[in-house]
Amino acid sequence: LACCKPAEQPTVDAARYRSFWLWAGVKPQPVLKTAKSVYVLEAQIDDGPHGPRWVQQRAATPRTAGPEIWLVLRVHTLIWSTAIERQLRARLAAWRSAGNRVVGLQIDFDARTRHLDGYAAFLKRLRAKLPQDTKLGITGLLDWSANGDPDQLAAISGSVDEVVLQVYQGRQTIPGYQGYLAQLKRMKQPFKIGLVQGGEWKEPAALKSNPWFRGYVVFL
């Protein structure tokens, strides 16, 4: 019967990578000691009954010597107040004052493929309000590569320094991810691929030869 079992699919071994997401409540792993970049969840921006709310995800500001740090905001509304913008600038300054090498801000927002124009406008406004030494990055959905409007994707690219396309939901790789990745030739902007630790993953042969591909980020 053993010969009838389906072949096991290769999975993501975090030790083979150097860039990671670290969410609140997730215990740091040894792979972080050799990390080049760490994307740290700092806060959520929620749509509260009286306007947007900054929901802090970390009680203290750690000091991490070595890797580049991207602060991540998990965003549920694109309507921000001046108070939210002030809080963002204050947190960027606090992390830097603690001795961290903060290089950028990443927005984690589930922008629907059919509404990327509104997201592009938001990112353009946000870009203008960030300190000049702070990069702007975003996460993206796999569907963008297959069905995203090229002009809207170009507008987004004009405001951000990097896009990380996530091939997972929760703790599982998205079924059929290979079909979406086959459409990456439509992407004319620099991108990374976001993987989940332990999730199924087999690198497409064409990916590394794609001139826009910039590497991986692994969700721990």
PLM features: residue spans?
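Secreted glycan hydrolases and related glycan-binding modules that recognize and/or cleave
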Residues: 3-220
